[in-house]
């Protein structure tokens, strides 16, 4: 599998998949036509009561048909019937939606092959926060068992909350009075993870339990709904990764016993040969526990026909703890010889020398979400409806990490000279053409599993980061029913205040050099006698490193530092902190129409939304002092004297929109839409802080290196990305189970993103130095994207029993874009003084999250008590930016996943349920800073769930 060419082989397979998709649609269309025999009236069809997957697909088809905008949906009339283990996995079954997977689960959502940056996500119609620093919703927070409808608006209308160039994802929970019946439901699932079974001392077993209750009281004027879930699972991972900073090394200058010569920007354009290397290579084994508690609640009060009051609250508290064991080749730019590279600078093989480190860390993350809102709907007359809504959403994520490093030395811990008589060990790097798995081979004379060889330069760090994201919002909407061409007039205003604050502080670096006798005592005391995992990276063809000497982190901290946890710094101030406030005021007016155009009924809406955004970003500035580490290197630390720098930005955008639906035949709709849309930068990308980075975990040896590593951690003056959009869709609904649709869309972007360098002054050890600081600006570039979206779904009811329980759905999206994102170090760069652009040496990426091909296929079978469903998802390669921006380019390779779900009704109200995720252990492969240059391969295995659900 890993020897395939990631660029060409995957592309050929994509073409084959697209062809298969077209063939399936051609096959399904006649089947649809056969399912509606002449004389079959609606009464006959309505007499059939359907449940399960078929009911969900029917509801989704009906939602799409009835909505005014172009919408795809996944909905169920009952709580807990969304067929997925998480909301993210449920969304990826919707036409045009795909996901980015982390820890084996669906996380960020891309619509029509466009990343989460271009999408907007709301919960019960309100913006939701997250702990990632961007505007995407962490769908893992929301159990699918407590959600009963998901809508994706592909086109905009004036009444929707602004923010979705690609679309808007709306997650909804039920309203208890609208549900209309009492329901008590309990479900318990056991999880088995084969990778977890390979962790020493773990069986790979976890569980999740869900309990929900819905009821109505006081003559159906008061309704309540409450759901709780406990999730206690494990998500072990194994990975190889290069660092996130890559350098172009001059191939015409060979340097030994030092770092390669960097291809400086002043020399760009001179045609020097170069190759691309990272600062470090790391093999990482992760053992993890993951716990989450979630509570959803809603109260609905309808005291009369004129009032409808809804209060809903969501709470999620998730904690996971990771034990990481790293083998780190920390000097990947040093003493490079025999370098073989291609015309793009991608290294195929090289030899190098580096200190080798056995690093260990204990990381814990706690993420708490609290959200909800109060909505009051009043109908003072049959024609007028007034709605006032207030909402609150807050996410707090806190990470604590304790890290320890032990390095190689010319001697072992017993003082015996090694065969190399050098702290740096020879190694080779090789990668076969087309593979994403490099083979790194350490000189065989060095025993990676010998604890005696890892003891020198003991370094201890205690990091804590905290992200606080809060949104307070209110809106007022009014709707008036009318007679004539316009059937309804709507207007409203919305105000919101979003705050994002974070810090990342370090209690360290503690570089300790006790007498070697003390090192020897601690080394022997704190050894892990066995590697924490069996068969490490055995699925990665070509991997040559399967284990290394590891140590107990708690023991090392206790013996070297006197405490297992020195605690976080009390003073959390840092120049890298972010403090962003964004205030939004928006208003809209929209008119719905429903008329006949000749013999064709036509309905739709036309409107305009005006959005005013004010951003205030505060950053701290301080002098820096040099602190000697005692090993010939130094680090930079801030003084206690800080001053605040405030940067403000403002923008006003006008967003017109029009949607029209033509009923060209009783079961055929033609939709057209035109609109202007906007997507705001991530909150973390608006920071005004500055960071001095040490990507390889080393320390500075001179002040010039320190200056070269200063960067902005945001660009407060970034404006929203704007686009003009046009969509046209044809939809055929032959019966309740079937749909055949095709949508063409076009987006014209006004502006892009481009690195820009500003000179800033810093005081370092009493000296004022001028430092070029790279940020991101809105470029004047124009770009576009066009695409085609296809959907086909049907149940094969024309087949003889029992095959008439078969059904299928397939969706495919093709997109083509010429948008450009430049690499912040090696790409084109704008000079604000000369107002010129200096060309880079590597090509740009496209939109973040943009995939040219997205395919989702489902096959299901339901008959009697049995329900089976298989789901296949494919996504072609895409660029994924790092949260916060101002980072180098990162690409994610094509991904394919196959999931399976099954249920068996044991008796009335009781069912046995089974689910398998990522059955074929598809890894995640990433590349930097150009596609094809391997940066990481990441395996997390399959997951299996089996459980029982009971309803009363």
Go through each PLM region and give its residues.
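Extracytoplasmic beta-strand/coil segments of soluble accessory domains associated
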Residues: 88-127, 154
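Short acidic/polar hinge/loop motifs at secondary-structure boundaries
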Residues: 126-154, 204
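C-terminal beta-signal and adjacent terminal beta-strands/loops
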Residues: 873-883, 903-952
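Outer-membrane beta-barrel signature, preferentially recognizing the C-terminal barrel domain
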Residues: 354, 358-369, 576-582, 649, ...
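Short loop/turn motifs that connect adjacent beta-strands in outer-membrane beta-barrel proteins
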Residues: 160, 176-183, 218-222, 306, ...
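N-terminal periplasmic "start-of-domain" segments of outer-membrane beta-barrel proteins
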Residues: 49-82, 108, 116-119, 126
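Gram-negative outer-membrane beta-barrel transporters
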Residues: 744-879
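Transmembrane beta-barrel wall of Gram-negative outer-membrane proteins
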Residues: 201-334, 349-350, 364-380, 385, ...
């Amino acid at each position: 599998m890993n020897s395939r060419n990631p660029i060409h082989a995957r592309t050929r397979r994509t073409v084959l998949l697209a062809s298969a998709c077209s063939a399936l649609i051609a096959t399904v269309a006649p089947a649809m036509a056969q399912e509606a025999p002449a004389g079959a009236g609606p009464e006959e069809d309505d007499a059939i009561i359907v449940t399960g997957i078929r009911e969900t697909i029917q509801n989704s088809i009906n939602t799409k048909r009835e909505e005014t905008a172009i919408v795809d949906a996944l909905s169920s009339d009952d709580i807990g019937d969304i067929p997925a283990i998480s909301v993210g996995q449920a969304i990826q079954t919707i036409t045009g939606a795909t996901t980015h997977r982390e820890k084996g689960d669906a996380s960020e959502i891309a619509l029509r092959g466009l990343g989460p940056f271009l999408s907007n996500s709301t919960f019960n119609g309100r913006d939701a926060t997250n702990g990632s620093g961007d505007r995407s919703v962490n769908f893992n927070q929301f159990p699918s068992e407590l959600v009963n409808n998901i809508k994706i608006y592909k086109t905009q209308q004036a009444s929707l909350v602004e923010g979705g160039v690609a679309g808007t994802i709306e997650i909804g929970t039920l309203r208890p009075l609208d549900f209309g019946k009492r329901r008590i439901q309990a479900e318990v699932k056991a999880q088995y993870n084969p990778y977890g079974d390979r962790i020493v001392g773990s069986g790979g077993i976890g569980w999740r339990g869900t309990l929900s209750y819905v009821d109505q009281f006081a003559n159906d004027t008061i309704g309540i709904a409450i759901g709780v879930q406990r999730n206690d699972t494990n998500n072990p991972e194994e990975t190889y990764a290069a660092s996130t900073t890559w350098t172009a090394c001059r191939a015409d200058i060979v340097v030994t016993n030092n770092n390669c010569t960097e291809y400086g920007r002043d020399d760009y354009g001179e045609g020097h040969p170069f190759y691309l290397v990272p600062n470090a290579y790391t093999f990482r084994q992760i053992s993890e526990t993951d716990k989450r508690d979630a509570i959803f609640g809603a109260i609905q009060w309808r005291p009369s026909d004129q009032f409808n009051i809804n209060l809903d609250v969501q709470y999620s508290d998730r904690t996971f703890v990771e034990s990481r064991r790293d083998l780190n080749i920390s000097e990947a730019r040093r003493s490079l010889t025999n370098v073989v590279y291609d015309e793009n600078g991608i290294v195929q093989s090289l030899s190098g020398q580096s200190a080798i480190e056995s690093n260990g860390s204990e990381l814990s993350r706690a993420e708490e979400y609290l959200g909800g809102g109060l909505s009051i709907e009043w109908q003072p007359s049959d024609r007028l409806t007034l709605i006032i809504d207030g909402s609150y959403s807050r996410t707090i994520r806190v990470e604590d990490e304790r890290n320890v490093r032990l390095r190689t030395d010319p001697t072992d811990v017993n003082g015996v000279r090694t065969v190399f008589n050098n702290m740096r060990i020879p190694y080779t790097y090789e990668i076969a053409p087309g593979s994403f798995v490099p083979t790194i081979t350490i000189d065989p004379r060095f025993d990676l599993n010998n604890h005696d060889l890892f003891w020198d330069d003991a370094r201890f760090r205690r990091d804590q980061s905290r992200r606080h994201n809060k949104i307070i919002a209110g809106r007022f909407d009014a709707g008036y029913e009318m007679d004539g061409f316009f059937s309804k007039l709507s207007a409203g205003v919305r105000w919101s205040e979003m705050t994002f604050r974070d810090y990342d502080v370090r209690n360290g670096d503690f570089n300790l050099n006790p007498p070697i006798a003390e090192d020897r005592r601690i080394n022997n005391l704190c050894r892990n006698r066995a590697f924490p995992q069996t068969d490490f990276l055995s699925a990665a063809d070509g991997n040559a490193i399967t284990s290394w000497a590891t140590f107990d982190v708690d023991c090392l901290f206790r013996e070297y530092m006197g405490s297992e946890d020195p605690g976080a710094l009390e003073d959390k101030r840092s120049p890298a902190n972010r403090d962003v406030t964004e205030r939004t005021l928006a208003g809209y007016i929209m008119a719905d129409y429903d008329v006949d155009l000749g013999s064709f009924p036509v309905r739709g809406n036309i409107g305009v939304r005006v959005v005013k955004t004010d951003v205030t970003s505060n950053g701290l500035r301080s002098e820096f002092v040099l602190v000697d580490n005692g090993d010939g290197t130094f680090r930079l630390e801030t003084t206690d004297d800080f001053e605040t720098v405030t940067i403000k930005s403002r923008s006003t955008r006008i967003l017109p929109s029009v949607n029209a639906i033509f009923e060209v035949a009783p079961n055929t709709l033609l939709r057209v839409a035109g609109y202007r849309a906007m997507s705001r930068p991530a909150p973390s990308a608006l920071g005004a802080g500055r960071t001095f980075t040490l990507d390889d975990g080393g320390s500075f040896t001179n002040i010039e290196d320190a200056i070269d590593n200063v960067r902005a951690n945001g660009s407060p003056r970034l404006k929203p990305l704007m686009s003009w959009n046009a969509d046209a869709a044809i939809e055929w609904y032959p019966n309740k189970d079937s749909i055949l649709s095709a949508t063409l869309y076009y987006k014209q972007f006004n502006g892009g993103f481009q690195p820009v360098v500003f000179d800033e002054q810093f005081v370092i050890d009493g000296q004022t130095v001028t430092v070029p600081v790279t940020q991101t600006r809105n470029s004047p570039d124009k770009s576009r994207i066009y695409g085609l979206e296809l959907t086909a779904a049907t149940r094969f009811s024309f087949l003889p029993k029992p095959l008439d329980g078969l059904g299928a759905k397939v969706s495919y999206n093709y997109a083509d874009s010429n948008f450009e994102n430049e690499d912040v170090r090696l790409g084109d760069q704008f000079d604000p003084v000369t107002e010129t652009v200096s060309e880079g040496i590597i090509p740009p990426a496209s939109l973040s999250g943009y995939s040219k091909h997205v395919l989702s296929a489902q096959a299901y079978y339901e008959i009697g008590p049995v329900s089976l469903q298989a789901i296949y998802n494919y996504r072609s390669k895409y660029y994924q930016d790092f949260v916060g921006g101002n980072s180098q380019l990162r690409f994610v390779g094509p991904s394919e996943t196959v999931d399976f779900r099954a249920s068996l009704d044991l008796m009335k109200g009781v069912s046995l349920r089974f689910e398998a995720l990522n059955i074929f252990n598809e890894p995640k492969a990433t590349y930097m800073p150009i596609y094809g240059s391997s940066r990481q391969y990441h395996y997390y295995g399959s997951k299996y769930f089996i459980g029982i659900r009971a309803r009363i």
